[in-house]
A protein has these predicted regions:
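Acidic, metal-coordinating catalytic cores used for nucleic-acid/nucleotide bond scission
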Residues: 51-55, 94, 118-120
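Helix-adjacent hinge/juxtasegments
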Residues: 62-83, 87
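Short, aromatic/basic amphipathic alpha-helical patches
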Residues: 59-68, 123-129
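Acidic, PIN/NYN-like endoribonuclease modules and their adjacent C-terminal/linker elements
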Residues: 2, 16-26, 91-92, 106-146
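Short beta-strand scaffold positions
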Residues: 77, 96-99, 115
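Alpha-helix capping/helix-boundary segments
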Residues: 9, 49, 82, 100-101, ...
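PIN/NYN-family metal-dependent endoribonuclease catalytic core
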Residues: 4-57, 70, 75, 138-142
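Short, basic, glycine/proline-bearing loop/turn elements
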Residues: 14-18, 81-90
């Protein structure tokens, strides 16, 4: 099983846990990452993720994300095909960086694209032609636990 975490889901364990939803999502991400470490799940990284992470103003968040992604077995370099697919996704209402993430996940044949972004979840789920399932961290735990 291959999983692509977007930056917001990858960073969720570092967010303030004041809200129950955030705390539960953080634990879900950590649980799935532990399955990645044990080799039960294949983690995907990408040039788009590396770019987005590099823009963070928090050195702790950069260190955390790069450490997690160093365990990825697959690294997706942006190419013409990914850029073309991302442009189509942008035309359908996905923001440009999210579109690059989704196109990268499709290129890597990710089973799941995990995000905490409600708008991206809604839009991604409404697209019947995506080659990856857009899912929240909480839903992902349910899927990998089966």
């Amino acid at each position: 099983m291959k999983i692509y975490f977007d930056n917001c889901s990858l960073q969720r364990p570092l967010d303030s846990k004041i809200q129950v939803r955030i705390a539960v999502e953080a634990e879900a991400v950590l649980g799935v990452l532990s399955l990645c470490e044990s080799g039960q799940i294949e983690l995907i990284s990408s040039e788009a993720l590396a770019f987005e992470i590099s823009r963070s103003l928090s050195p702790d968040r950069v260190t955390w994300a790069l450490e997690v992604l160093s365990r990825a077995r697959v690294y997706v370099q942006v190419n013409d095909q990914i850029e073309s697919r991302a442009r189509l996704l942008v035309e359908r209402g996905i923001n440009p960086l999210d579109a690059l993430h989704l196109a990268s996940a499709e290129e890597a044949r990710a089973d799941y694209f995990c995000t905490c972004d409600d708008q991206l979840l809604r839009r991604g789920r409404s697209m019947t032609d995506l080659n990856t399932k857009v899912i929240s961290p909480i839903e992902l735990v349910g899927e990998v636990g089966q």
